[in-house]
Amino acid sequence: MDTPPVSGFSQHTPANGHRDASNDVPHAPACSPLDPVSDGLQAAAEAAMAQAKARVRARVRAARTALSPKVRAERDAAVVAAVTTLVQDRGWSRVAAYAPMAREPGGSLLVPALARLTTELWLPACRPGRMLRWGRYAGPGSVCAGMWGILEPRDAPQESDFLGSLDGVFVPAIAVDDQGFRLGQGAGFYDRALAGCAAPTVAVVYASEIMPVPHEPHDVMLDIIVSDG
């Protein structure tokens, strides 16, 4: 999938090629499920991976919580400016995004900005089985608090396989590395939703959240990163 060049202070294209083997961020090894020794190694590796992800999540959440209202507002405005530049530069008119939770980059500015910039804006709704369905945003009255307290579309008729027909998909992240590997909240909603997605996928983070992240084979690799610089 093609990606835009790095532009200005806020867009970042994940690096191509293989990761540096010297990186101390854990990777999930492949072990045979038929070998008891390998089973033990696999279990230990999975536990180490879970702990590594938990540490990164805790660190990023603490940093977000520590931001003053003034700094948060400035960073959110810069994030939305980066999103605006990307959408305009690429000529995107049909996109999917999300309503950020408290303290997530972009804040309350993200959805209104994308609604102004595009002709179609689709938002996710959480469903049982950790699945996402998608509904078209049609103003504040078209959304309500969902099962996790996040604003979701009242009507979400589309399954995630429709995302490939859009111009781009904006994705929340705790952190993302320079390869495009994303660390999410841990429930796996987006790993399922974006599997095989043909549309360009965009991580939305603060610049300090572009960092090495532990990842596993099922973790989604994103195409573009936007941040506050």
Kindly give the residue locations of the regions a language model identified.
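N-terminal active-site beta-alpha-beta segment that forms phosphate/nucleotide-binding
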Residues: 2-164
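Conserved phosphate- and dinucleotide-binding cores of soluble alpha/beta proteins
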Residues: 5, 15, 19-21, 29-32, ...
